[in-house]
Amino acid sequence: MRVLSRFIVAASDARHFPGEDLPEMAFLGRSNVGKSSVINSLLGHKIARTSSSPGRTRTINFFEVRWPGRPKPQIIFTDLPGYGYAKVLREISQHWATFIEPYLTKRASLALCLVLIDSNIPPQNSDQQLMDFLRAVGRRLVVVATKSDRLSGNQLASSLQNLSRTFREPRLLAYSAKTGMGREQLWQEIRAAAAAFSEQRALPS
């Protein structure tokens, strides 16, 4: 699916967040897990900045997404700071209470959390802690196993089984930004979350 997209804002404080009119899809994960590459792959062009340096993103970056032929955007992608590297962990933790935690706990337009994990390494405690936190605050989530093209069929099956058993998450998708593996399945999850958000908004208050 080809879509149109535009960068909106890089927010380093909750006061800089845009309005909450559209459903938002948050991309979370360890540093260098490939969040920006997954976003660029989904959108079909390079809009999120990629870097080989861990922890490059220090802000929540908002991108509006519009279906072709539609005059207005339909959803928002948000790229959150990565975690897991000691040299950036202190800086991220300093900002957690300022804008990351308020975004994940209080943002009314947050429709789906996409937790990206590297399929090539064992399950990490930091990923488990994030998922436990998201479940505790009632967030809808899907786990995306990135860089899946680097594994053979048997290796990938074993990795997914291990990740599913560890994280106890039924919605687990193998993804490759390089080959496009899992792209349509992930779009299905995003569209379903957007539809659920719209239905919830339509209910009488």
Kindly label every feature range from the protein language model.
Residues 21-22, 40-42, 90-93, 128-132, ...:
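Short, glycine/charged-enriched secondary-structure capping and boundary segments
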Residues 99-171:
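Conserved C-terminal guanine-recognition region of P-loop GTPase G domains, centered on the G4
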Residues 15, 46, 85-88, 124, ...:
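Conserved protein kinase catalytic core
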Residues 1-85:
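Conserved G1/Walker A P-loop phosphate-binding module
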Residues 56, 82-84, 120-122, 147-152, ...:
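Conserved nucleotide-binding/hydrolysis micro-motifs of P-loop NTPases
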Residues 17, 57-62, 75, 81-111, ...:
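Switch II of P-loop NTPase G domains
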Residues 63, 146, 186:
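Residue-level signal for inorganic ion chemistry
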Residues 2-15, 150-205:
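Canonical P-loop GTPase G-domain recognition
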